[in-house]
Amino acid sequence: MDMVSPVLNLQSSILGELVGIIGKVFFLLIEEIKYPIITPKIIVDAQISSWSLFFFASICNLSAKFREPIVTTSSIISLMESEKDLKNVNEYFQIMAKMLFILENKIVVSLFVVFNISVLIIVKSEPYSYGKVLFKPSSSIF
């Protein structure tokens, strides 16, 4: 019996829960920022970060449910570190696309594609508006 897989699943599950909590709190804080003094770039970058946190948490939780380490702790940390240097929304999608090479579950991959297409449509339809949160998920997502 291989003991590595349960350990990775436990790590993924715990990290998923922690990242999910951080993402939710961060999103709520960003939702309160509705003043014109905040530049659109800051709002967009902040929303990208909160969506990324939520996405990583979802993948971790799915990984634990399927008892397969779909996303390992190190891959999440490395992607989150690379996210700090984002210049624009396009780079965000490029970094998130790297996740497709890590994922092995077709359901997760299809959800990932639908999620990114919906975010891309929102970004294209409402580019840079002052004091407005661009990505506002429905309460059912959380």
Swiss-Prot record:
Residues 1-9, 63-101 are cytoplasmic. GO terms for cellular component: membrane. It is found in: Membrane. Keywords: Membrane, Transmembrane, Transmembrane helix. It comes from the Eukaryota. It is a multi-pass membrane protein. Residues 31-41, 123-142 are extracellular. The chain crosses the membrane at residues 10-30, 42-62, 102-122. Partially overlaps YBR063C. This is Putative uncharacterized membrane protein YBR064W. It comes from Saccharomyces cerevisiae (strain ATCC 204508 / S288c).
